[in-house]
Structure formats: structure tokens, C-alpha cells
Amino acid sequence: MNVLSLGSSSGVVWGRVPITAPAGAATGVTSRADAHSQMRRYAQTGPTAKLSSAPMTTMWGAPLHRRWRGSRLRDPRQAKFLTLASLKWVLANRAYTPWYLVRYWRLLRFKLANPHIITRGMVFLGKGVEIHATPELAQLEIGRWVHIGDKNTIRAHEGSLRFGDKVVLGRDNVINTYLDIEIGDSVLMADWCYICDFDHRMDDITLPIKDQGIIKSPVRIGPDTWIGVKVSVLRGTTIGRGCVLGSHAVVRGAIPDYSIAVGAPAKVVKNRQLSWEASAAQRAELAAALADIERKKAAR
């Protein structure tokens, strides 16, 4: 059960996953004092209380009974693994080698420890992966055939974090969610990348930055996007379909569909769609030449 009253507004849809922008996303500011008072009020009134604004919270140390209390095992999006269809797939694809068996075991342990996290299909987990979602405050949904490499850290402190199908994460990536992050289908992420949907406030020089609260804005990463090594994606970013983010880019704002963006801050330097359309004649000539070669081979 989500105790945050975030609200929603209409959004766009990438693939099969609806993308919604929570109300007040650009002005989601909380302070440490407000957070403490709200959490005390929540502890006194129980899990049915509504928080007026989201405090800074952490999920580390959440006891197992809290995770099971927020279980989503009956959610229709939750995949069922021990079925005849899954057994047929394992046999048909010979997915019973040691590599697969280790990952089945990791997924089983993960599901038993995190029944409040939605997995819509098979998820392949590497070594040392940390996936956290605050029970009753955050919703984490992982799509089908997602590969999460070694030592990735995925934290849904609050709000919503959604992975599409066939997402591939390299190693040592960090994703921090306090409001709303969506990663579309078939996104390819290299190593040592960072994605977050919040910033620390730093306006008041008389108050420590850690006590000034945070500002939150949603992040959208479109399907079929390639994120290079050591890329940072900051709050309030919308990345279109089929984009390429060059290594070490710092991305903030809107990146149009099929763009190649590089630099810090990231700037669009090329459009893949325009390049593809411009090379149509060249591709046609190449196809005709190959067809002519095959025709001559067949005539011999």
C-alpha cells in the first residue's frame, strides 16, 4: 500500500508501460524537520495515514515482516515462475546449465526477501546486486528478461521505479528514486552510470545542505536507448526513443527521439533517424549490387 498522496496526471505511453507525471513533480521539496515530524505522525497513526508531502526516508534495515505486509504476490503483474510453460521453456532452450541455475537461485532468494517488489518475468541477477524498495512507501516494478549485472545498486526510497522488458544493466550502476523514474524497453546501460530524480537544496548558506531537504522531478528514459559508460542522468530529464548518450555525458532536460548526445552538459550532435533516411539511396545501391552478385553465382 502506498501511503504517499502523490496524485497523477495524464502522460505518454512507451511500449506497454504507461508513463505518468505525478502532480507537483517539479516542486516536490521537503525539509529534514518536516520529514521528522511527518514520520512521527505516521508512526502514531499507522499505515493508513496520508503524508502531506514525502519525507526523506531510507529502506535499509526494513524488517522482513514489513516487506511481507506490503506483499504484492497477488498483483496481476506479478509473474508466476513454477508453471508448465516455464518448464517447457527451460527444456527447449537448455536453460539448466550452471550459469542459469545460479541465477534461478539468486532470483528465488530475492523473491523470498522482497515480496513487495513486482517482477513481471525472469530477471537475471549478477553478483553483489543490491535492490531496495521501502515497504509501503515505494513501488518497484521490473519487466521481463531483465539482466542486472554485478554490483548494481537500485534504490526506490519513495515513489515509483519501473523497468521495461529486456533492459540490460552493466555493472556498478546506481539508480536512486524519490519520486518517479521510468526506464523503457530494451534500454542498454553500460558501467558506472548514475540516475536520480532528486537534488539536494543548497540555497541557504546558514544551514547544512544535508538539512535543507530535496527537490524532485521525474525522469523518463525511452525504449531502445544506449547509455554509455559513466553517464549521469539528473532529475527532470526526458530522453526519447532510440537515443545514444555518449560516455561521461551529464544529461539534464529533454533529448529528442533518436538523438546522439555527448558532453557535460550533454548536447545533441546528431540525429540517427535523419542519418538513416539520408542513407536510403546508398543502401538501395548496396542491396542491388549484392543481388546482382547472387544472380551471377546462380547462373554459373
From Swiss-Prot:
Similarity-based family: Belongs to the transferase hexapeptide repeat family.
Gene Ontology molecular functions: acyltransferase activity
Bilayer-spanning residue ranges: none
Keywords assigned: Acyltransferase, Repeat, Signal, Transferase, Virulence
GO CC terms in record: peptidoglycan-based cell wall; plasma membrane
Its biological purpose: May be involved in the biosynthesis of 6-O-methylglucosyl-containing lipopolysaccharides (MGLP). Regulates host peroxisome homeostasis in response to intracellular redox levels to favor mycobacterial infection in macrophage. Induces the expression of host peroxisome biogenesis and proliferation factors as well as peroxisome associated enzymes. Inhibits the induction of host pexophagy mechanism by down-regulating the expression of pexophagy associated proteins and adapter molecules in infected macrophages. However, during increased oxidative stress conditions, it induces degradation of dysfunctional and damaged peroxisomes.
Class in the EC hierarchy, top level: transferase
Signal peptide: 1-25
CDD domains: LbH_MAT_like (cd04647)
A Pfam family: Hexapep
Enzyme Commission (EC) number: 2.3.1.-
Protein name: Probable acetyltransferase Rv3034c
